[in-house]
C-alpha cells in the first residue's frame, strides 16, 4: 500500500520531519489522497531547524499508528530547565603577562605548591601575582588536601566524607616553600575537615607559626572554615601569629541554606567573625606578629548574583558591622559547572560601585567590590593600606604623649 511513495518514505530527512511535526493515523484511504493530505498539513506548519534539534524539542510523547494498526511512540527530548544567561562583556579579564607573574608561576610549579589562584582559574591572577610599585605580590595557598567534607552548591572542590589523612610534614614543607617564593603577602586557605577531631585547626596553626618563624616580614592571612562554631578552635588559629583572620559569609541569610552546606549556617559564620574581635586584646601568637597586641583584622566576602535582594545585602552589612568586621569584598557568583547553582543575575559594575560606597559609608575599613573580585583580591594591597594607617596613628599618639 506504500508502493507509490516508497522512495519518499525511505528519505531520512522526510521521515524525521514527518514524525516530529505531524500526528498521522493510517486509514484505508487511497495512497494519493493520504500523500496529498500530508503535503497540505506540512505546508501549513511553520517548522524551523529548532524543531529538528533534540535540545530544543518540546517535552512531549507523541503516539502514532502505523498502517497495520501497531502503535508507534516517539519521545521528544526535554529542553534545558534553567535558562543560561550569557556572560556580559565586563566579565572578561585581561591575560596575565607581566614578568613577575611568569616568575611566580614558574616558582609555584618548581616548589609543588597548590594555589587556589590556578586551580580555581581566578581571573585576577595577573594582578595579584604581578605585584608592582603600588601593591604587593599575593597568592592563595590551599592546605589540608584538596577534598572537602562539605558540599556547598556554589563550589566545585571535590567532596568526601572521609578525605585522605593530613600530611604531618605539610606545615614545614609549605612554610619552607613559601619563604623561598619571594612573596610579601600570602593567603592560606583550606577545605573543611569535619572528619578530624579538631577539624584541622592545629594543622592550620602550625603552618602559620612555621611561616612566621621562617619569614617574620611575611604578612599572613588565614581564610578559615567555621570549625563547626567551636570557638576554642577558632582561638587556636586566630592567635597563631596571623595578620588577617578571614571567614566568608558567602551570601545573605535567606539564601544560606540553599547555597551552602547545611552545616554552614549564617549565624555560625557571623559568630566566628565576632569572636575573633573579642580576643584582639590578647597577645597574638609569636613575638614576630606585626600587630603586636592590637589583634588581627577580620574580613569576609559576599557573592552577588544568586538572587539576593538589596535589603538582604544591607541587613548582612549591618550584621557584619555589628560584629566589628573590618574588611568586606563583593564579587560576582559564576556557576562552576552545570551541576551547581545557576547564576540568577549578572550584577553591573555600577551596582558593585554602589555597594562599595554603601559599605564604606557604614564604617568598614576597606571594601573591594567588582564583578571579578574574589575573597583574596589584592589582599596585600588592602591590608597594607589599613596597616600603614594604623601605624601612623600609633606613631602620632606616641609623639603627642
Swiss-Prot record:
Q: Name one Pfam family in it.
A: LIAS_N
Start-end of Polar residues biased regions: 51-70
Q: Where is the Radical SAM core domain?
A: 133-365
- Protein EC: 2.8.1.8
The source's superkingdom equals Eukaryota
Look up the record and name the cofactor or cofactors this protein needs: [4Fe-4S] cluster
Which controlled-vocabulary keywords does the entry list? 4Fe-4S, Iron, Iron-sulfur, Metal-binding, Mitochondrion, S-adenosyl-L-methionine, Transferase, Transit peptide
Entry-linked PANTHER family: LIPOYL SYNTHASE, LIPOYL SYNTHASE, MITOCHONDRIAL
Extract the NCBIfam families matched here: lipA (TIGR00510), PRK05481.1 (NF004019), PRK12928.1 (NF009544)
Protein name according to UniProt: Lipoyl synthase 1, mitochondrial
